[in-house]
Every structure is written in structure tokens, then in C-alpha cells.
Amino acid sequence: MARGRSRKRSRSSSRSPSGSGREKGGARSSAASPGPRHRLSSAAAREGRKKEGRKKKKRKAKASSSDRSSSSRSSSSSSSTSSSDSDTRAKQHSRRKRGKHKDKKKKKKMKKKLKKKSKERVKEERGVSEALPGPSLELWQKEPLADSGPVLTDEQKSRIQAMKPMTKEEWDARQSVIRRVVDPETGRTRLIKGDGEVLEEIVSKERHKEINKQATRGDGLAFQVRTGMLK
């Protein structure tokens, strides 16, 4: 009987590890094959990750769009400022031109007014001179010839004519005349062009000697007359 019990115990003990192995295998199988709850949680996590990725993409798109809008605004503002600067410059240039044109017009008007005033003054002076009573023809005819004044000589007439303005042609003709003038005191003869330009005459040696002799004689006589040596 004791042997039979020991065999049963050995069998039970031999069987017990197999049962424990079965339990372990069941635990392993349960751990290897997840349940429906675990599957649902993993799917929810995946969906959450996808949503977060979409949100990140949307944020990035918004940031890029905001950057683009800000850059476009800055470019538009810079273009508007540049256009406004160009407009102000053009306006200033046009104002300057208008101011210059107005100044020119004012100067022209002032010149015209001055010319008119000068013409009016000349007319008034002429009118006053014409209005003054002058000697009539009858008075001139009745006056004696002795009171008419001294008779003008040729030199005085020439001086009066010289005081009158001459044209360029008359001046050139007068200055082109060459004449030989003799000094009455010394007896020297000179070639004078125009009003007093002395010209040199080219002569031979013999003629030059004769001219010098005559000049020295004339100079000596003139000196004696001035000093009173000759009477």
C-alpha cells in the first residue's frame, strides 16, 4: 500500500510540472496575442499622431503664408514709398519750373514797364520843349546883323564838325588820308596820317643828309628867334 501511494504521488508530481507548463503557455499565448482593448488603444494613438502631424503641417502652412503676406506687404509698402518719393520729387521739380517761369514773366513785365515809363518821359520832355515859346521868324529878321554874333572861322567849323558823331566809314576815310605837313618855325616836313600819326619816309642817303642839314638850320633859327638873338 505504501508503494502504491508513493507511485501516485510521483505521478502527481510528474504531472504537476506539465500543468504548470500549460499555465505558462497559456500566459505566453495571452501575452503574444493582444486583446481587443490593446488594439483599440494602439489605433487611437495612431490617429492622434496623424492629427498632430496634420496640425503641425497646418501650422507650418500658416506660418509660411503669414511670412509671404508680410513680405508682400513690405514689398508693397516699399514700392508705395518709392512711388510716393518719386511723386514728391516730380511735384517739387514742377514747382521749381513754375517758380522760374513766374520769375521770368515778372522780369519781362518789369522791363516792359520801365521801357514804357522811359518812353513817356521822353515824350513829355519833347512836349515841354515844343511848348516853350521860341523866337519867331519876324524877330530874327528884324534883329540887326551885328547882333548875330561873331562869324565862325574854318577852324571853328571843323571843330564843330569834329564834335559831331561820325560813322565808321567816315572815320576810316579820314584816317586813311596821308598829307605832308611843314613846320613853319623849323622848316621840317613830316608825313602825317589821319589825325596825327607820324610816318617815316624812306629816302636815299643824300636826301637824308639834306633833310638833316635843313632841320638843323631851321632848329637853330627857331632857337635864336625864341631867345631874341635875332631881331
Curated annotation (Swiss-Prot):
Family note: Belongs to the ARL6IP4 family.
Gene Ontology process terms (BP): mRNA processing; RNA splicing
Top-level taxon: Eukaryota
Compositional bias ranges of the Basic residues kind: 1-12, 51-62, 91-120
Subcellular location: Nucleus, Nucleolus; Nucleus speckle
Ranges where the record places region Disordered: 1-155
Cellular component annotations (GO), alphabetically ordered: nuclear speck; nucleolus
Sorted UniProt keywords: mRNA processing, mRNA splicing, Nucleus
Ranges annotated as biased composition (Low complexity): 63-85
Designated name of the protein: ADP-ribosylation factor-like protein 6-interacting protein 4
Record lineage: Eukaryota, Metazoa, Chordata, Craniata, Vertebrata
Role: May be involved in modulating alternative pre-mRNA splicing.
InterPro entries named among the record's database cross-references: Nucl_RNA-splicing_assoc_SR-25
Originating gene: ARL6IP4
Main location: nucleus
Pfam families (UniProt xref): SR-25 (PF10500)
